[in-house]
């Protein structure tokens, strides 16, 4: 049964058409994911459905007394309310009852012997029974706990941005609604909370419509995808994975149709140019048909960004941290941290919110001076730093002028030189948009522009602080492809599980109280291992033995030896690949003996390096065997 119908919605923003007479309906208990490039109007469509924005043409009808709850991307909570007062705000009978009960409980707590206040509490409890509000009360406390909101008496104006988002989510989940609309619900949430929210939404009693950049979340929560692109809305039954398959089919069909149109147009033009004899009416029909074919537009790709920008050469010394200590407000964030970053690494930094991940990232990039220890950055290192905050972007600059401040020309990975205008076009900023003022861009478009500006600096070490926030899934896919080809080092803080699985090969894990551990592998591998460790029971006999016997300090490799061991197999594979490539280059050199001599010298050097690496692998493996025996 449909709970909401939208017919022929039309809306523009400036000279851009956001919705070109789109129609759709939302069924009970549907889970809809709305996707599309930044700036296409996804958040606007959510607000239109929620009744928060108007449309120029079309109509939205709701069946009966359908209730809609809306989560803003950056919620602004009313000052003067506590967390609990905000959670229970609303005009439903249940919310009014909960407010009365909490007030009676609070007043009695101040004067427990007051008979009048005791009567008020008894009356409030009776009302809770009558309105079946106890379940809502339990749900509210559970949701707040799961979202990490513990102090319900705190004024909302004292909360951080992330805490406000959590409180807003809690309010939306608790309020009775037939349709729950969520705009980027996973922003500011840690991965454990996101996984809980996935499970909660799968059991939610109403329909859900959401915009999110988190592709795992999108895939696990939704059963229908709406794709908003260039004013049109395409619908797909299934989750994000099914959508990717079906969109590829749709684009292939559109390309076939365009090929047929082009062939027919060429045939008709050839006929007319030959001046073939025909009755004038028939000739006129051909001319009309040619004009019609010319006016038809071919399919436009869903968009492809080209991130193939060059980078500066990176030497062997990248970044080394020795006994780094960082404290904040009397709390230890980083305690005696040691790290050796080697060329080509892909490192993810993970941990709960507010634990110090961004602070460590800033320290490794030379932006924050640690309280103790040393951080050494190699002389050839050229840092590109993508931060969460792009508020320093001058809104009065035009798009093209902002990019030209970094570079007017940039070299691609292939060695070609392209202009700032061409680079912007590759980033889905057409010429017509390049004269737009930055203040007029959507949040996602600003992030994409900022990303381009960072990459145009041609870095060889890329620091990414929550890069997936506010970027559309399309841009994220291409950023991941860029990282695949990027020859330098990538160090990222991210809560995006898909992104971490896709780009990093080892993790720096914040455990709390300044303790930092490491994990070699993907984020999903790390989570599986963590869950297995928590689930594994500890044998009582072993625990008693461990208590009775004096603890023996376990021997292990030195820190630098362990780092070398972690990366040596990759190093051997790279040298083997290089040796094979040189062999092929020698064969292809033909009779160019000067070139052959040069290649053979390089091959001999590579063979020596490979042999030395193999010897070192043997040496380290023997050391490990001895330590484990």
Swiss-Prot record:
SMART domains, per database record: AAA
Classification via CDD domains: ABCF_EF-3
UniProt KW Transport keyword: yes
Stretches the record annotates as Disordered: 284-304, 530-555
Recorded coiled-coil stretches: 560-629
Annotated keywords: ATP-binding, Coiled coil, Nucleotide-binding, Repeat, Translocase, Transport
GO MF terms held by the record: ATP binding; ATP hydrolysis activity; DNA binding
Binding site for ATP: 36-43, 351-358
Residues covered by the ABC transporter domain: 4-255, 319-537
Basic and acidic residues bias locations: 285-294, 540-550
Record bears the keyword Repeat: yes
EC code(s) of this entry: 7.-.-.-
Regions of compositional bias (Polar residues) in chain numbering: 295-304
Recorded family membership: Belongs to the ABC transporter superfamily.
Name of the protein in its database record: Uncharacterized ABC transporter ATP-binding protein YfmR
Organism: Bacillus subtilis (strain 168)
């Amino acid at each position: 049964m449909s709970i909401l119908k939208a017919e022929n919605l039309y809306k523009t923003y400036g000279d851009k058409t956001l919705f070109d007479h789109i129609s759709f309906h939302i069924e009970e208990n549907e889970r809809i994911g709305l996707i599309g490039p930044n700036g296409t109007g996804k958040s606007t469509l959510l607000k239109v459905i929620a009744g928060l924005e108007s449309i120029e043409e079309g109509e939205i009808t709701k069946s009966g007394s359908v209730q809609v709850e809306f989560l803003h991307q950056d919620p602004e909570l009313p000052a003067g309310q506590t967390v609990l007062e905000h959670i229970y705000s609303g005009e439903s009978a249940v919310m009014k009852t909960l407010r009365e009960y909490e007030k009676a409980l609070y007043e009695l707590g101040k004067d427990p012997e007051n008979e009048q206040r005791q009567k008020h509490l008894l009356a409030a409890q009776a009302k809770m029974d009558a309105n079946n509000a106890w379940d809502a009360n339990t749900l509210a406390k559970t949701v707040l706990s799961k979202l990490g909101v513990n102090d319900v008496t705190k004024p909302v104006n004292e909360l951080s941005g992330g805490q406000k988002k959590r409180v807003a989510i809690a309010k939306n989940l608790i309020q009775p609604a037939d349709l729950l609309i969520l705009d980027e619900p996973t922003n500011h949430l840690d991965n454990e909370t996101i996984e809980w929210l996935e499970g909660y939404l799968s059991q939610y009693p109403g329909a859900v419509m959401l915009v999110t950049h988190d592709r795992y979340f999108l895939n696990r929560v939704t059963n229908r995808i709406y794709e908003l692109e260039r004013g049109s809305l395409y619908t797909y039954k299934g989750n994000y994975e099914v959508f990717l398959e079906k969109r590829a089919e749709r684009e292939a069909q559109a390309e076939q149709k365009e090929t047929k149109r082009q062939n027919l147009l060429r045939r008709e033009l050839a006929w007319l140019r030959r001046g073939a004899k025909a009755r004038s009416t028939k000739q006129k029909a051909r001319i009309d048909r040619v004009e019609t074919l010319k006016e038809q537009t071919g399919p436009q790709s869903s968009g492809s960004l080209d991130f193939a920008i060059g980078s500066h050469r990176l030497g062997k010394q990248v970044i080394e941290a020795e006994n780094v200590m960082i404290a904040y407000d009397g709390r230890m964030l980083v305690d005696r941290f040691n790290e050796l970053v080697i060329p080509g690494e892909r490192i993810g930094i993970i941990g709960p919110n507010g634990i110090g991940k961004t602070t460590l990232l800033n320290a490794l990039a030379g932006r924050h001076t640690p309280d103790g220890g040393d951080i050494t950055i190699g002389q050839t290192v050229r840092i590109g730093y993508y931060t969460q905050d792009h508020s320093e972007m001058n809104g009065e600059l035009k798009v093209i002028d902002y990019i030209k401040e970094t570079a007017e020309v940039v070299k691609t990975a292939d060695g070609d030189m392209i202009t700032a205008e061409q680079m912007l076009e590759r980033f889905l900023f057409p010429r017509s948009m390049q004269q737009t003022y930055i203040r007029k861009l959507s949040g996602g478009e600003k992030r994409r522009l900022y990303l381009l500006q960072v990459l145009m600096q041609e870095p060889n070490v890329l620091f990414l602080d929550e890069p997936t926030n506010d970027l559309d899934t399309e841009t994220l896919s291409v950023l991941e492809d860029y990282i695949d080809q990027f020859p330098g080092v990538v160090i990222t803080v991210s809560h995006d599980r898909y992104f971490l699985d896709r780009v990093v090969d080892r993790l720096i894990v914040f455990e709390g109280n300044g303790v930092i551990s490491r994990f070699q592998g993907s984020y999903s591998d790390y989570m599986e291992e963590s869950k297995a460790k928590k689930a594994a029971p500890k044998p009582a006999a072993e625990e008693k033995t461990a208590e009775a016997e004096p603890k023996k300090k376990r021997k292990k490799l030195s820190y630098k030896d362990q780092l070398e061991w972690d990366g040596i197999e990759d190093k051997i594979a790279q040298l083997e690949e290089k040796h094979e490539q040189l062999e092929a280059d020698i064969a292809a050199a033909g009779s160019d003996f000067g070139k052959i001599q040069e290649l053979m010298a390089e091959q001999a050097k590579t063979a020596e390096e490979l042999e030395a690496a193999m010897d070192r692998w043997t040496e380290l493996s023997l050391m490990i065997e001895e330590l484990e025996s």
